[in-house]
Design a protein with these regions (language model features):
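Extracellular/surface-associated beta-sandwich interaction domains
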Residues: 1-466
């Protein structure tokens, strides 16, 4: 649980460094000083084109042919923000780094959300691949997740800070916190006050953080929460994004500041911006292993796409993409008091178990819903309990764009079916074509047994005579 029950600074002792970002196109079109073609040819930084992941997808004229990947670079041996531990590097596999977000459509049962589906570039294949001994897990949490990032029961919001604001007294564990209730999330229009507000979730500037993070009081950034713009630093691409997610100083007053900000809004302990801080933990947990030699049929992997790509340095390398489909209805663990999928307000993703730096690149990351629903009642009047058959039914969608090279059986367009065509800017764009796939697993179907799906429709049939 990574010291989740702690009520002191040890609550953050297992938090390691994690950077999440989408690489700016400027690195490929107008290379900043210090960035070479060799840097742009690494598996973790090279540009991903649509034809690599979706080779049969037609791109309309004028549309981008580049996939803007979500990249996560995890540094398990380096302390993350608000971590006062001196032992982060001594046992990296026990550390974690994670991110969370709000979910807009919260009723998964009504929306029939069935899968967490994503494409990941295999980090163990390609130029600059990850050492094969560096393995771990990616976890996903769905449900009610505490927004109290720095656990103290008080909601931090940066625009409530500053010399003219009322702060909690005595000072809470992690730093300064506003004593008043938030009404809006907007910085002060006064330039001087603004500088005193954009100081991170601990409510302390770097000059004052040493009083709390005493083990690192001599460093320039004792709380390890400073923001750095990726074009205002040096090193490789992943090095430049290393501090891009820091909340202190990420909203500079002057828009012409070379240290350009990442947001114009205050950082708050209110992920879904409903003006309240949720402190309840009641969620479902899922995970996938990240390791060499991942294959279809294991670890929730449903498809693999391998191809050769040409790199900016003139060489070529193999690219191996893995498609994961995690059934939402089959969590590994259930934490807290949650019994259904009618109120899934948050999603969290975190990495753990790795021994050294690792970059994971998501070509797509979706919550997938279906129009077809499983029929859970019995179809055999002699067997009223279908739950004891150990028969699993997966309801999937397969399509020509993503699964045309799927192993062991690839998807092909059915006989007599032609892909719908769209005329766009004097060009013909073939639309995606897909089918419903029913897959039985577990012990399979018993003799004379069956499984079914159904679909709710709203069609008035009274106007038809037959």
């Amino acid at each position: 649980d990574f010291s989740a029950g702690a009520n002191d600074l040890s609550y953050g002792f297992k938090r390691a460094k994690l950077a999440w970002y989408s690489i700016d196109p400027i690195f490929y079109t107008q290379k900043p000083s210090g960035i070479s073609n060799e840097d742009l040819s690494l598996n973790k930084t090279r540009r991903i084109f649509s034809r690599e992941l979706y080779p049969v997808t037609d791109i309309a004229q004028g549309q981008t042919q580049v996939i803007s990947t979500l990249d996560l670079t995890y540094y398990p041996s380096e302390r993350g923000p608000y971590n006062n531990s001196l032992n982060t590097a001594s046992n990296p596999i026990s550390n974690f780094g994670g991110i969370m977000r709000a979910v807009n459509s919260t009723n998964f049962e009504q929306g029939n959300v069935e899968y967490i589906q994503f494409w990941v570039l295999d980090p163990y294949v390609g130029k600059g691949e990850t050492p094969r001994s560096n393995t771990g897990k990616i976890y996903f949490n769905l449900g009610e997740i505490s927004e109290d990032v720095l656990k103290d029961g008080r909601k931090q919001y940066e625009n409530g800070l500053g010399p003219d604001q009322i702060l909690a007294s005595p000072r809470p564990l992690w730093g300064d916190v506003p004593a008043s209730q938030s009404l809006i999330y907007a910085f002060d229009s006064n330039v001087d006050n603004r500088k005193n507000q954009d100081i991170g979730l601990d409510g302390l500037s770097s000059a004052n953080e040493g009083a709390v993070y005493t083990n690192f009081a001599s460093e320039l950034d004792p709380a390890a929460d400073d923001y750095t713009y990726y074009l205002n630093t040096s090193g490789g691409i992943t090095d430049r994004y290393k501090n891009y997610n820091g909340p202190e100083g990420n909203s500079p007053v002057n828009i012409n500041d070379p240290n350009r900000g990442s947001t114009t809004f205050p950082d708050v302990e209110d992920i879904n911006r409903d003006n309240t801080m949720n402190t309840i933990n009641a969620y479902y947990e899922y995970s996938v292993d990240i390791q060499p030699g991942m294959t279809v049929g294991q670890n929730n992997i449903t498809d693999i796409r391998s191809t050769q790509v040409t790199l900016p340095d003139g060489s070529s390398t193999e690219a191996r993409w893995l498609q994961f489909k995690i059934p939402v209805s089959q969590p590994e663990n259930t934490i807290g008091n949650i019994s259904d999928f009618r109120s899934i307000r948050f999603m969290r993703m975190f990495m753990t178990g790795f021994s050294s730096e690792l970059s994971v690149r998501f070509g797509a990351l979706d919550l997938v819903r279906g129009e077809w629903r499983r029929y859970t009642n019995t179809l055999d009047f002699n067997d009223t309990n279908v739950a004891d058959d150990n028969t699993n039914l997966d309801v999937l969608a397969v399509n020509i764009q993503e699964n045309n090279e799927r192993c062991p059986v690839n998807y092909v367009t059915p006989p007599g079916v032609q892909r719908e065509q769209l005329y766009n800017n004097n060009s013909i764009i073939n639309q995606n074509e897909q089918s419903l796939s029913l897959r039985v697993s577990g012990d399979g179907l018993e003799p004379q047994d069956s499984r079914a799906v159904f679909k709710n429709v709203s069609i008035d049939m009274r106007q038809f005579k037959k």
